[in-house]
Design a protein with these regions (language model features):
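Intrinsic-disorder/low-complexity coil detector
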Residues: 12, 20-22, 32, 40, ...
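Residue-identity detector for glycine
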Residues: 2, 48, 63, 70, ...
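Long, charge-dense tracts
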Residues: 1-78
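Predominantly extracellular/luminal cell-surface or secreted proteins
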Residues: 5-9, 16-21, 102-108, 159, ...
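Beta-propeller and closely related beta-pinwheel folds
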Residues: 57-153, 157-285
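Beta-sheet repeat architectures centered on beta-propellers
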Residues: 26, 135, 201-419
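Intrinsically disordered regions, especially transient/low-confidence alpha-helical propensity segments
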Residues: 47, 54, 90, 415-416
Length: 419
């Protein structure tokens, strides 16, 4: 079934399937999600290139706007904003308003039925998150065998299937917990657990398949008022069981939550934070390193930096410095004043106060910071130096939480402790 046009009268295939003549048979590419791709380096472009482009979404080739309408979110040409994306069980999932819908199985650009007269397990899924109040979906998080759906109405849903299969026949959406959450930051998946945020709080969500309603436990109970009211960007460092997130109202602050397990039990956890000398606008982790996009400003412009931080430094001979840089392009000795000038290409730091040369911390005579390089001048002859570290000193402060009584599982027990 469907609509075809003749494309050849001599070679197969003779026919080519085309979109139906009925209204709303295609998506507006400009209003749908776009794709970011990387073109590999070649002779014409030795560094490669990122490209941001539209997606060729599948057309409706069978049925009508009644028998094969596509996602309910766009029913009858309704223009609604897509608020969330996710990839789960070989399907692309999208959400807007109180609707959640998926692509066809193994075809992330197809949101129409292949045959309007016969629905199969592979066809797209379309569900509504209904409760006793309007529940607008704000993000989607794949989690174990479920899709965790967070809403702006203090209700969390899960979308699941049966017999390890999620299809138009088995998809089930049900409310699973009822907690307020921060609106501008997504829940974070760390290991086999979901963490989500609220004002000055961090929760861990426990998914128990044997119960209809699940619980979330506040893991920040022992440090009241330590976390920010509003959040911006976040990431996880899986190898160290750590979550990082920053303060939307003061982007120089990056908070961390880390825990240690014994089997399935958390035996230790802690919060701490870094305070940088510049705003953190984005961050992500790769391996055991954290990569930040930060900004600084001079009198006329905003400068963006890409910075790397080793989350746990194992070489204790490396100086601990902010904005640390090690690759110098030249070291020039001047016999006239017995000084050596180091040049660091691609390094911008207007707050340089420390340089360590071959393990020796030297006094800085002068330094300069330009658009493409920085220079540091020290007293003495060091033009044959092997290792050089330059950066800014910082202060470490340790703040302990109040004392709480805990149960055998290490959980804080609320109440009054009498000694």
């Amino acid at each position: 079934p469907g609509y075809y046009r003749v494309q050849s009268d001599t070679e197969k295939p003779f026919l080519n399937k085309v979109r139906t003549p009925h209204p709303f048979s295609m998506f507006d590419k400009a209003r749908m999600p776009h794709q970011l791709s990387f073109n590999a380096p070649d002779d014409n472009n030795p560094t490669g290139q990122w490209a941001f482009s539209t997606v060729n979404w599948n057309l409706r080739t069978t049925g009508t706007d009644t028998s094969n309408p596509g996602p309910k979110l766009f029913e009858n040409g309704k223009q609604s904003e897509i608020k969330a994306l996710g990839y789960f069980r070989n399907r692309m999932w999208m959400a807007g308003e109180d609707k959640v819908f998926s692509s066809k199985l193994n075809d992330i650009t197809n949101f129409f039925l292949d045959d309007a007269a016969s629905i199969t397990d592979e066809d797209p899924i379309d569900v509504t998150c209904s409760y006793n109040k309007y529940t607008e979906v704000i993000n989607l998080t794949p989690f174990e065998n479920n899709l965790f759906v967070n809403t702006g109405s203090d209700v969390q849903f899960t979308i699941s299937g049966s017999d390890n299969l999620i299809s138009p026949f088995t998809a089930e959406v049900s409310p699973s917990s009822f907690y307020s959450t921060a609106p501008l930051i997504k829940p974070i998946l760390l290991g086999s657990q979901i963490y989500f945020f609220d004002s000055k709080r961090l929760y861990v969500y426990f998914n128990d398949k044997t119960v209809s309603m699940n619980n979330a436990v506040e893991v920040s109970y022992h440090c009241p008022d330590f976390l920010p009211e509003k959040y911006s960007t976040s990431t996880v460092v899986p190898s160290f069981d750590t979550i990082l997130f920053n303060n939307r109202q003061n982007k120089k602050e990056v908070f961390c939550y880390t825990n240690r397990y014994s089997g399935e039990q958390v035996i230790q956890n802690a919060f701490f934070k870094y305070v940088y000398d510049r705003d953190v606008v984005a961050m992500n982790s790769y391996d055991s390193n954290i990569y930040f996009i930060t900004t600084t400003s001079d009198e006329s412009r905003t400068i963006h930096h890409i910075q790397k931080q080793v989350f746990q430094e194992k070489d204790f001979s490396v100086p601990l410095l902010d904005n640390s840089f090690t690759k110098f392009s030249s070291a020039v000795y001047s016999p006239a004043d017995d000084s050596t000038q180091f040049t660091f290409d691609g390094y911008y730091n207007p707050t340089i106060d420390t340089i360590v040369v071959d393990g020796e911390s030297l006094a800085i005579q002068s330094f300069g910071t330009g658009i493409t390089a920085s220079t540091v001048t020290v007293q003495g002859k060091y033009d044959t130096a092997n290792s050089v570290y330059v950066g800014t000193k910082y202060t470490t402060k340790i703040q302990l939480s109040p004392i709480f009584y805990r149960d055998q599982g290490g959980n804080v027990i609320d109440g009054i402790l009498s000694l």
